[in-house]
Amino acid sequence: MRTESTRTRPIIPEIVAHRGYASRFPENTLRAVRAAFEAGATHIEVDVLLSADGVPVLMHDATLARTAGRPGEVAALTWNDLARVEVAERSRLGEAGAGETVPSLSQLVRLLEAHPDTNAFIEIKRAALTRFGVEVVISRVLHELEPVQERAIVISFSGDAVRQARAHGARRIGWVLERYDDDALSEASRMAPEFLFCNYTKFPPSPQRPWVGPWDWVAYEVTDAAVALDLAARGVRFMETMAVAELMSALGAQRQ
């Protein structure tokens, strides 16, 4: 007689590639996004700033120092200038990222169109909001995202930005929490975003579940499978990670 296993199968979370497959390739580049898709990720997250002439580009930092190894502000350069800036992150990756340049949001949209089963979280950075104003940034970003609007989710630390995105027709929005406290819960309840992002270290200790609401949770930066499984068991649907293939492989082993 065959004995059925009584071991409960773990809940396997979904993966969000944080700035693409950024542990192996330069963050926020088309190469990093392609690599994430090739590794099997169906959700990616990228950061957006505006160039001097108002073109949305994929960049996390307001300056070029860390990723490009040169002085200068993103908002001080036109798109034509930024398109020639190499963002190889040589101090972190050596020559592995050689030749990668700053991509525009429109270039990412074309890549998403070539991968119709994927979704993208588009994080609008506060530096852009401060420099250009919320209305301008939201308008420019949503315009670029129109071809993939059903699969693109505008997110930000700025509650005002995501509220404006909703008001201007964004299908789905996500709020990135700075704090996990009662004030943030009240704001999230009023905003009712489809997604809440949070640094997983800010969650209450296990086995407590994070707030329940009309949102799905996205926890970042998760690289450990045990942490991911614990969070998933507590109701967190997505794990955001730069170590895309590594975490997916470790979680895949749990399905055996």
PLM features per residue range, with description:
Residues 1-256:
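Phosphate-group recognition and catalysis centered on beta-loop-alpha active-site segments
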